[in-house]
Amino acid sequence: MRLKPLLGQITVYTVLIAGSAIMAFPFYWMLATSLKSPQEAQQAVPVWVPERLKPANWAAAARLGAQGGSMWWGGYRAGRSVVLRVYTGEKGPEPVVTIPTPPAAFSDPRADNTRIETAFEDGWWEVTLTNGGQESFRLLPVRLRIAKSYPTYRLELQPDSISSRGEDWELSWSNLAPGVLGYVLHNFREAWYAAPFGRYFFNSFFTALTQVLGGLFIAAMAAFALARIPFPGKEFVFSLIIATLMIPGEVLLIPNYILLSRLGWLDTYYALIVPWLASVFGIFLLRQFYLSLPQDLFDAARIDGATYWSQLWRIALPLSVPGMVTYGIFTFLGAYNALLWPLIVTNSPEMRTIQLGLQAFIGEAGSDYGALMAASTLSILPIVLGYFLAQKQFVQGVARSGIK
Amino acid sequence: MGTRLALYLGLGVVAVLVRLLWELRFAGAGSYALAAVAALAAGLWAIQGKPLPLAWLGLAIGLAGTVAGYGLPWLSLLIPLGVFVGYWGWARHVSEKDLGAFWGWALVWPAVGLLLVWQVIPAFYALWLSFLDRFNFIGHSRFVGLLNYEILLTRDPLFWKAMGNTFWFVAFTVPIGIGLATLMAILLNEKVKLQGLFRTLYFLPYITALTAAAAVWDWIYNPEFGFLNWLLGTPGFQWLSTPEGIFARILRPLGINLSGFWAGPSVAFVAVMAMSIWHFLGYQIVVLLAGLQNIPKEYYEAAELDGASWWQKVRFITWPLLSPTTFFLFTLSLIGAFQVFTQVLILTPTGGVLQDTLTLALYLYNKGFRDSNFSYASALAVVVFIMILVLTLVQRRVLERRVTYEA
């Protein structure tokens, strides 16, 4: 098909680009928000490029991070001093620096053991925070009050939030000694520490991979028998399998929940894996593949004395790799992205899959959208990376599902 | 013998399944004993004529499994294992046809067994539960026949609310989704540059988990700081907690007041739908693109020779020849609409203001797992099952006639 050359081409590209911009926007917005401080995320006019992505801030973050701990991840180690310079030009009222204590804490060793010295040098205030205690900390939150009477002032590291307090401006940093990575990925690190995402990822990967491998094994055996072995009762088995296709997932939620509870399997990996091991989709897909292989291959193997078992393993399986990849991708996606089933059959935090962990985190994070978007980004990262690595397989697998 | 071997194996597996049912309190010890004895008897029958040492060993293992299975359920797996030990001895003395019978069943049993235990039996169990009164883990429940169905269909406004929402969901997302996807797929199929890049971008939402995607849209819809309100210049608009129907909202300035079902889906539910269309569009585009690429080029060349316009080619070649794919997507979206859950739970955790975003799946979850009323939820599930079944059949009958399968 050819459109009327130029005008048509322009229309096509305009529509396609506009469409892809809408499709991609939520991803951009998720990523951008995940790099913002709370105040930046809650601007009336959207901030397109977060402060944390600006290289000018990275140098300061690295220097301050190196003072407190390491250049990459920063920190506030015992015995270290972090020096913040506030360039004011002239000497006016002394800025007041405090370390905010978490609400509802009896004592805060970080604030109690920090020595704060403020001195005026040539045109700037030099604020030195020294960790005099024995304990090291991951973060150094700092609050600084500076008089509004200064016409201008400049800071090395942009504060995360600025608010007005009477005669002063109150500037605050969630971490004054972040290091480069600790600065850019602040929300990611905080989200990672706020909930056991490592455990969630393990649960998701473990259950999804087991489902893929176990399901593949079971589906390959059944598909091979249905495609290549004549046996009495084959039609019956086949129609039974087709019949199960008609049962929607909702019908199975309650009875399977009861079965699992009677087996004592609730809140275990079994509950997440076993009910979905046998996949009708997989059986159909692989059967289609095996049917398309030439019969001669199997006859030759039979004459050479190969049993059905070794025909399956030596001939059918190696020749159906594309089908198995399609099945694997779909099953993995389904298991990794599932929310309803894990929500029903697990209840302890240790058994949560990543989606369930994210759902719980949404409840806990409240209005900290930076951390929330960081957690969301983390949760989709493995799938998106996998998609970019095996794009062809993903797309072909989906396309194949639509063609009879 | 031969098929006797398959029978022996089959009865062995059945014995294991019955042992499992006993464990699940669906069957008694007696039925297990019966099944196990039947399996062993079939074994003896299979052995007849060719009594080999390994066959006897297999039978002995089966017997041990039967006994041990009384105490530890999983030890009943020794019964089918015994069949394989026996087979090892027999293999050389068995005809080709009998080998097929044995291996065929041996290979399908794991899948069939799992499907029976986790899909077929539970489906019937759900049906049975729906006839009971308030079945849950506490106390006894009695058989009440169709009471749950009667309450559900005649006295439960929430069920009809959820049905109405499902209807609107289909009525909005299916035509808009398929329409947009068809447009995009046709445009992508024009030899555009960077086709791969476009396809990647369009497909990306589909592989993202709904949970994360919904979290992002929740943030975009945020009334105070959300991007959408900034874009549309409607600060403070509560996208996800406005229960007013959109038809009512649009027509109110004209002096027309609509209420109930005819007020249309609530603003909040339309927001959920927009997110769902975004999520599913990439899948539809990729499937349609594959369908488009299957249409032979000759048709277009012939049409061009006859001087057909671009639109004529789309209307008279692409659309009819794409109809099997469109039909497939239509069926899939229809079934999918009955299962909308995740995005609703994340965007409107309680089912929205006045339950305006309640979907059937969410209602089922609420009834079953928040109110712990398993029987009522089962009745709901059975009704959904029947509806999907009827709709699919009607679709087959009515719509599929218009589908052009052959080029």
Please place each PLM-identified region on the residue numbering.
Chain B
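Transmembrane alpha-helical segments of polytopic membrane transport and secretion proteins
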Residues: 1-12, 18, 22, 41-58, ...
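Alpha-helical transmembrane segments of polytopic membrane proteins
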Residues: 27-38, 72-82, 171
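A structural signal for multi-pass alpha-helical bundles of membrane permease subunits
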Residues: 100-407
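Short, flexible coil/linker elements and helix-boundary hinge sites characteristic
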Residues: 24-27, 49, 98, 233, ...
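Alpha-helical transmembrane segments of multi-pass membrane proteins
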Residues: 15-22, 117-123
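Hydrophobic, membrane-facing alpha-helical anchors
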Residues: 33-41, 124, 352
